[in-house]
């Protein structure tokens, strides 16, 4: 990344990642591929296409409609964001089975960007502090 951003006068520091994405909340336990047959799941894109090949029925539902759809049984499962956000929306109350990882959505690396000219002006000890902080962010979010 540093080589890429060099042309823009920036220096990049890896500073964490978004973590593993989850596979979704399910009203019923998934024990085999056969359990996907007829399963109505809020999921889109490539993942929806793949799960459809397994017999699932992908559903396009807005984020705010997921909880009531799970609660009423309009859908059987839903993939959304991740543990923190999903729990805040209460999915665990209406769909007790939570599976991981979400193979269809890899995590993203996060970076702190600094103007190269300003970086060059910093005293060595500030550079060391900044570099160490970025490394700690990456280490702390690795798992």
Predicted segments with their positions:
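N-terminal secretory/targeting leader peptides
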Residues: 1-143
């Amino acid at each position: 990344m540093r080589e890429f951003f060099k042309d823009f006068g920036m220096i990049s520091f890896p500073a964490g990642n978004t973590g593993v994405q989850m596979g979704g909340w399910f009203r019923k336990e998934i024990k085999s591929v056969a359990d996907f047959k007829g399963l109505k799941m809020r999921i889109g894109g490539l993942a929806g296409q793949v799960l459809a090949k397994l017999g699932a029925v992908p559903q396009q539902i807005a984020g705010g409609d997921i909880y009531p759809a799970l609660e009423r049984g309009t859908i059987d499962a839903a993939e959304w964001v991740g543990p923190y956000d999903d729990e805040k929306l209460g999915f665990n109350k209406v769909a007790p089975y939570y599976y991981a990882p979400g193979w269809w959505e890899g995590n993203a690396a996060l970076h702190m960007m600094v103007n190269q000219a300003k970086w060059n002006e910093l005293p060595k000890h500030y550079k060391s502090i900044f570099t160490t902080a970025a490394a700690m962010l990456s280490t702390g979010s690795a798992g």
